[in-house]
Amino acid sequence: MKKYIVFLFLILTVILTICPIFAAETERRDSTANFPWAQQRSYYQTTGSFLTIGEEELERRTLGDLRNRLTGMMPAISVQEKAGDFWSSSYQSPNLNSSSFQVFLRGSGNQVCIVDDIYIPFGQVQLDPNQIESITVLTDILDKAKYGPMASDGALLIRTKKGGYNTPMQIHVDMEGGIGIADRIPEWVNGIEYARMNNAARAVSGYSQLYLPEALEGFSQKDPYDMKYPNVDYKSLMLKETLPLSRVGVNFNGGGDRVKYNFSFNGLYSGDIVKNSASNDYSKLNASASLTAKVGKYIEVSADFNTLLSFRRKGRTSWYNYRSVPAVAFPLTLGQSLGDDGARLNTPIYGVSRTFTQNYYALGLEGGFNTERNRTGMLNTSIDLDLSWLIKGLKSRTLLGLTQFVRTTIGKEEDYLGYYWTSQDGIGAISTHTGTKKSGKSILSSYTMQSLSFYERLSYDWAANGHKIAAGATFVMNDNTNKSNDNYQRQLYVTADISYAYTDKYIVEFVAQYAGSSRFNKDNRFAFFPSAGLAWVISKENFMRDIRWIDNLKLHTQVGLIGETDIFGAPYLYQSDYSAATNGMWLGANSKQDSWFGTNRYVTQYVTMNRLANPDLGWGKLFQADLGLDFDFLQAFSFSANFYYRQSTNRIVNISDQLPAIFGLRGSDLYKNYTKEHLQGADFSLNYARTLGDWYISAGVNASTWKIVSDRLTNDEYIYDYQKRTGTTVDSYWGLKCIGKYETHEQISSLPAYTSDLQIGDLIYADINNDGQIDTNDRIILSHTLPRMNYAINLGFGYKNFEIQIVGTGAAFFQTPMTNSYFWNGWGDGNYSAFVRDNIG
């Protein structure tokens, strides 16, 4: 294993802006933040972490994906970019993750995206910064409970721009362009290296060598078309190291006495590093429109529309196919068809072999193409009523939202003309690749998702003599369906919340939630979840007034329960499930000697139980406690610390592996509220910002730490206590403990063995249970694989309208297991990685 890997990357951005330079803080003590159901609360009305990001901070970063713009901005969010693409490979995923991005929010990877109070998978909307007014990060328990069960693991609450009343029209145009560089592509051996390593492997195994000296000499010519000794550099033929990037955005907003508006249009184009196939690129167009109008004195009506249209064009190969075939497997091409094999005259003939039956270079050129087209439409309409004529401070808000997502993949799945080849015989018979062509495109796959949301909220605000009360009740309904699930997924819940603040020093909040889900039996469909919060602004106390270097000191805490349910989880798990099938049985007269029951075939029908009923199935529950401290001092520094403990109980899992075989139910599922785990962690941040005339400087550092421990698991029964997973972290890495290498034959004969074919130089493993043999009972925890600390450094320098930002993020205190998968690249005659080449011995 690599010992305590620490990774760090830096992003340098230079921005020319037409707006003033703003401070780099993400927590503003003098501002308000948006909360669920169109609520706005000041810093002195909340008991949570108050993590909010404004449009200025987002627009200052020139990165094409919104998730990348969040990198390093606050300790609660950890963003890892795994690849440099922008298209969404997880359009169904309820969280922010994809194959290119891994996003954690206080240890959870299941946070959701909420746009204008409507949940939508992030991959289906992909908003740009000029469409966003603010992002509020919901991390503390009471803040999450305000929205409901879907936010149980945290959420990004995005509020889009609406324009402003009595505001002149403002037009903002921004453009980005650049080049993406693939800095790390796995390296694999060239043809000569492969031949030598293959010879060595065969010699060790007692086989004759395939590649004689004249073959090695031939491979050294590096000729991909050599009919005797080909050596193909697939990486240079199929990949490039750069790709173009460009983005343009236009936003204009404003308003008059009765109407306000906001319109945004954005386009993004990204190339690809795959070059030997049909067009490989990604294009995205999105637009948003918001129109709000006052109708009379007490009514405000608004309509918001967001749409996304994206195209992902690609061939039938992926970037990693360059390593799938050894460089010496066959020549790239073998000539041209004479027309006697069913192909057109002069059709290129590509080489394949009996061992490696796919020529990925040819597949990229002639294997066809496909275009993934995504279309998203979000339409929200709302009516706000000012009921102060009835009760002063009373308001009503009604919203209806409809979301439609359609993904269609259209293309051609064609084939190239391939012949088998060997170095001894040259061109052989035609392969299974016969050069099939299609006359037109066809639909290769499709996916649809629909969501209907509705909520009604009554709110009441009152303030007098230093007392402030904000209260509300919200009724929410969500209805979701998608192509992969024929059943509707429905949630219905009611939340009641109240906040009380006295002289901006003492704040109390309560949230009560009564939630229901269609996933459960009617007797267990609804559950009650309460939350509470307290905050004390110590700096406003009289005894603190003489300490002038302290600008703000606030202690806050929240504690409560929230329901856990997967909105797209399998429904009706509380019911039994059966499947019917037919089978043939041989009975009757016996006309063959090898037939036991006869040779007349009779069709019989039978029913199999796939799932056992559990009518007691119900909500999983999440208990969470949060404690935080905010400390601003010297009118330049801002410090925050947040500690949290979260325990998940009664998660729904399949416990069929715990049923004794004597029950006769093997192969049948049984779901139960069973597993339990807890998470504990902390976030810290320290920021500095100062403006000196036309100069501006900012600096910040933040860090977070967390770990998740399993408290109850299924099938956790072992002979030895040290093998139990209960009580260990979820990222624990289990394996045999290596204590050295065999150096003598005496060691081989005397020490516990794990195979009968031990050789000098093989690894020695510890016999943990002292039973004289090495087996699975000797597996112990060797390390953990998730970082124990994520951190970020932010630096900013500005002069008038010129600004430089430096953002660095990293992770520390974890280990990467060097498993057999690293060393077994090239098993048999397969290709070898450079890692294997460099670590032989």
Model segments located where?
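Bacterial Sec-dependent N-terminal signal peptides
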Residues: 1-27, 70, 532, 701
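Membrane-proximal, glycine/serine-rich, low-complexity loop/turn segments characteristic
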Residues: 4, 22-112, 118-120, 124-130, ...
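A generic structural motif
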Residues: 57, 269, 516-518, 690, ...
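Conserved RecA-like P-loop NTPase ATPase core
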Residues: 70, 117, 135, 158, ...
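Catalytic-site beta-strand/loop segments enriched in glycine and acidic/polar residues
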Residues: 114, 471-479, 507-516, 764-786, ...
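Structural motif
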Residues: 115-116, 502, 799
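Extracellular/periplasmic, surface-exposed regions of secreted and cell-surface proteins
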Residues: 290-299, 305-309, 353-413, 423-731
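Surface-exposed, extracytoplasmic segments of Gram-negative outer-membrane nutrient-acquisition systems
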Residues: 601-610, 647-676, 707-785, 803-841
